[in-house]
Curated annotation (Swiss-Prot):
It is found in: Cell inner membrane; Cytoplasm. PROSITE patterns: SECA, SECA_MOTOR_DEAD. GO terms for cellular component: cell envelope Sec protein transport complex; cytosol; plasma membrane. Belongs to the SecA family. GO terms for biological process: intracellular protein transmembrane transport; protein import; protein targeting; protein transport by the Sec complex. NCBIfam families: PRK12904.1, secA. Monomer and homodimer. Part of the essential Sec protein translocation apparatus which comprises SecA, SecYEG and auxiliary proteins SecDF-YajC and YidC. The gene is secA. This is Protein translocase subunit SecA. Signal peptide: none annotated.
């Protein structure tokens, strides 16, 4: 009661925010007459003036009224559109680093131009983030005309662009692109080997369109750049054959749809074990024995593929490939793959070619990528329901912008049926009735399967209609643009983020582009254009009189936002419209999250075949169910972020250090420091503090010096000298290593030596980081089990992640030292050190990275000191044969106390020497 009274007296937080922005609107409007009086050249020259003032110390906030007035006038002249007052408020909200919630059709694209123009005056670049490539290209092309008029440059990032074009696009004042492209460019840049090869510049301001889709719906989706791992195609097929039979027995597994999880029962595990043994997959031991852990993993992923993932709902098979469907937008997600072997399990299930598994080389979530921007803002039609999450995770406040005209849409109460069949029959009947009028209909479904089922029902009734789902995504823009034409009936999977407004009467601009594309005669083109415009205007009046767009939802989504986005397709810019949702007790939301009380009450009402119940109480109950789901999903995203933040802190440190290495001209001191640390570790390990020479492990230390430093030193003789202690041995090792490196540098020449040092550092860094990511991922998967031991999994993860990070840095120092001690340069490089030089090592599976090593830089893996074998490029001494870790015949005579050439880190006598 007190909260209601306070709102009545002081207004809501949103009202107070709006008032603060509204105070500046008259100031902008007052400048309009004098700005309109400027000719085109004088108006464009304002940009130069503004930039000079910013350089002189004027803040962007102080420039806002003038800059907005100039941008509004330029839009009027170039685009034929003038910003409304509410759009000015939207621009201010974006400039303030907040989220502007604007209803569909209120001109979000135009609103963004105000904040984009103002931020671009700083000269530091603005990134405008869209949900798909079509929108990025469209907005860059259309709004680019406005920016060009004002003297600003515009770039657009699309897939498969060469790096030179990407770099040019990022150097532009304004850069359009999808969230995927921006994120992948960030990861690729941090895998480059030269600063000048990077494409992005330091981040400044990102304005995210459909911000809820990107920062909420896709928050837990990591962007991953991966390289090939070992091929397990045969194992996937064998396991799939077993699981295909197993899922016919419901008692063999337990499925939890609410949490999207499935496990084998004891009976199921016994059945799988017997079937795998019969198939020859399980050769020894039980299913859960440690040496069969890979088989368990394949079984679990295959079980998930068969029980939790449905064809035409979660994915489709297209062109012999399994393509993921975005659960929020219904679009195909080409290029994306499920990780951890799940995608391969789906390929085995669908009997298509199984692609090779990948190992993560670099990854980041959208949550952490967008938090890299010093300034972040966004816009969407539906954000208020997730305002708490935006505030808590991104520190972004949501401001609801009032519509320019009152919303005239009529939202009817839901109709609830007992079965899905009755529900779809009722929907078909309603569409059949509306089809007798000019009123257009948009029907929203939750999957391809359901959209095609409804399409069949309408076809049987002889009702003409269009279907928009992932199968027909090429026709998306055309279908959506004409969904408001008289009599149009459109069935669409999730309409979220479609980006094209449904205009009553049809989209005149798109019709002109499509129908007049091949007409070259100017007079004929003008005549036909006038006819189309007149016809669309007539159609607009017809549809308006018929009641506007009728939106039908065939199922409630887990998120209220998706429902609101579907409703919001009707009633844009004050147009009339209607919406109604049809629901059944068999729908996923009702079946999984609905209350037993609701189902019991509907059963007691004794509904007959085809009857529905319509009551506001039902709507409230459904909203409560949706809120429960939203709260659960928020908790899951928040929990994921806590773990991801641990890795994110490490990622930022690694990328910053790597960038320092790339930018440095001379890394000799860094390499020397690493070598010194390794020598200190070696000596401390073999010569205990305050020990006698008889207690030293002199032979082992000599082997370490040979294996790691490439030095054959008389350490046993040193031990017999008077007055020699561990410190003296350390100094002698350091001096010997320094002299060896100095001799190499003199032999190679300074330029080649500096080049090799940088390449060895970068490639080794990439190698240990890749292994570290794998270790973190494996630890993350099992860390939740620590809760059974009364330990906090998050604290355990933080502690062990730090230990792994420390071990990674130790491995980096070791491998760099070992590699630099053995690297040699073949004669062709000595003659011409930079002839055809490319990166020493780069993964050929990472787009945009060089994959050929420099001519003459040969490779030989080296043994490690307490770490895994290096997989980086080092050189075999000239005249020596290469030692191959997997080929014992290439090892020659190996001393029994030396490190094993296989790279295990063990002594030869305890490794392959023992087996020999």
């Amino acid at each position: 009661m007190f909260a209601s009274l306070a709102r009545a007296l002081f207004g809501t937080a949103n009202d107070r925010s709006l008032k603060a922005f509204q105070r500046r609107v008259p100031e902008i409007n007052a400048l309009e007459p004098q700005v309109r009086a400027l000719d085109d050249a004088a108006l464009a020259a304002k940009t130069v003036e503004f930039r000079q003032r910013v350089a002189a110390g004027t803040t962007l906030d102080a420039l806002l009224p003038e800059a907005f007035a100039v941008a509004r006038e330029a839009a009027r002249r170039v685009l034929g559109m003038r910003h409304f007052d509410v759009q000015l408020i939207g621009g201010m909200v974006l400039h303030a680093g907040r989220i502007a919630e604007m209803r569909t059709g209120e001109g979000k694209t135009l609103v963004a131009t105000l904040a984009v123009y103002l931020s671009a005056l700083s000269g530091r670049g603005v990134h405008v983030v869209t949900v798909n490539d079509y929108l990025a290209r469209r907005d860059a092309e259309e709004m680019g005309k406005l920016y060009a008029f004002l003297g600003l440059t515009t770039g657009v990032i699309v897939p498969n662009m060469p790096d030179d074009e990407r770099r040019a696009a990022y150097q532009a004042d304004i850069t359009y692109g999808t969230n995927n492209e921006f994120g992948f460019d960030y990861l690729r840049d941090n895998m480059k080997y030269r600063i000048e090869d990077m494409v992005q510049r330091p981040f400044h301001h990102a304005i995210v369109d459909e911000v809820d889709s990107i920062l909420i719906d896709e928050a837990r989706t990591p962007l991953i750049i991966s390289g090939p791992a070992e091929d397990s195609s045969d194992l996937y097929r064998s396991v799939d054959t077993v699981i295909h039979e197993l899922v016919k027995t419901p008692e063999a597994f337990e499925k939890d749809e609410k949490f999207r999880s499935v496990i084998l029962t004891d009976a199921g595990a016994e059945q799988v074990e017997a079937m795998l043994r019969e198939a020859g997959v399980l050769i020894e031991g039980g299913l859960y024995d440690i040496h069969n852990i890979a088989v368990i993993h394949h079984v679990q992923q295959s079980l998930r593929a068969h029980t939790l993932f449905a064809r035409d709902v979660d994915y489709i098979v297209r062109g012999g490939k399994v393509v993921i469907i975005d659960e929020f937008t219904g679009r195909m997600m080409d290029g994306r793959r499920y990780s951890d072997g799940l995608h391969q399990a789906l390929e085995a299930k669908e009997h298509v070619e199984i692609q090779q598994e990948n190992q993560t080389l670099a990854s980041i979530t959208f949550q952490n990528y967008f938090r890299l921007y010093p300034k972040l803002s966004g816009m969407t039609g539906t954000a208020m329901t997730e305002a708490d999450e935006f505030a808590e995770i991104y520190k972004l406040d949501v401001v609801e912008i009032p519509t320019n005209l009152p919303v005239a849409r009529k939202d009817d109460d839901d109709e609830v049926y007992l079965t899905a069949r009755e529900k779809y029959e009722a929907v078909s009947t309603l569409i059949e009735d509306i089809a007798k009028t000019p009123q257009p209909v948009l029907v929203g479904t939750t999957s391809i399967e359901k959209s095609e089922y409804l399409s069949e029902l309408l076809t049987k009734r002889g009702i003409r209609h269009n279907v928009l789902n992932a199968r027909f995504h090429e026709m998306e823009a055309t279908i959506v643009a004409q969904a408001g034409a008289p009599g149009a009936i459109t069935i669409a999977t999730n309409m979220a983020g479609r980006g094209t407004d449904i205009k009553l009467g049809g989209n005149v601009e798109m019709r002109i582009r499509q129908e007049l594309a091949e007409i070259e005669d100017p007079e004929e083109h003008a005549r036909r254009e006038a006819e189309i415009r007149a016809q669309v205007a007539e159609y607009h009046d017809i549809v308006t009189k018929a009641g506007g767009l009728y939106v039908i939802g065939t199922e409630r989504h887990e998120s209220r936002r998706i429902d609101n986005q579907l409703r919001g397709r009707a009633g844009r810019q004050g147009d009339p419209g209607s919406s109604r949702f049809f629901i059944s007790l068999e729908d996923d939301l009702m079946r999984i999250f609905g209350t037993e009380r609701m189902g019991g009450m509907l059963q007691r009402l004794g509904l007959k075949e085809g009857e529905a119940i319509v009551h506001p109480w039902i709507n409230k109950a459904l909203e409560r169910a949706q809120k429960k789901v939203e709260a659960r999903n928020f908790d899951m995203r928040k929990n994921t972020l806590k773990y991801d933040d641990v890795m994110n802190d490490q990622r930022k440190e690694v990328y910053a250090q790597r960038r320092e290495y790339m930018a440095a001209d001379d890394l000799a001191a860094t390499v020397q420091d690493m070598r010194t640390d390794i020598i200190h570790d070696m000596v401390a390990r073999r010569i205990p503090e305050r020990s006698f020479a008889e207690q030293w492990q002199s032979a082992e230390l000599a082997e370490d010096a040979r294996g790691i430093l490439g030095l054959d030193l008389p350490i046993a003789d040193w031990a017999r000298e008077d007055g020699v202690d561990g410190h003296a041995v350390t100094e002698r090792l350091e001096q010997a290593a320094l002299q060896a490196q100095a001799a190499k540098a003199a032999n190679f020449g300074p330029s080649v030596m500096r080049y090799i040092e940088k390449q060895v550092l970068l490639t080794t860094f990439d190698s240990v980081w890749k292994e570290h990511l794998l270790a973190l991922d494996q630890m993350r998967q099992g860390i939740g089990l620590r809760a059974y031991g009364q330990k906090d999994p998050l604290n355990e993860f933080k502690h062990e992640a730090f230990q792994l990070f420390t071990a990674m840095l130790d491995a980096l120092r070791l491998r760099v030292t070992s590699t630099m001690s053995r690297v040699e340069v073949a004669p062709p490089v000595l003659d011409n050190p930079f002839a055809g030089v490319a990166e020493l090592h780069a993964d050929p599976h990472v787009p945009g990275l060089a994959s050929e090593p420099a001519p003459g830089l040969m490779t030989q893996p080296v043994g490690s000191y307490g770490a895994a074998t290096a997989d980086i490029a080092v050189a075999t001494p000239i005249g020596a044969s290469a030692i191959m870790p997997d080929d014992p015949s290439s090892w020659g005579e190996t001393p029994r106390n030396a490190l094993c050439p296989c790279g295990s880190g063990k002594k030869y006598k305890h490794c392959h020497g023992r087996m020999g």
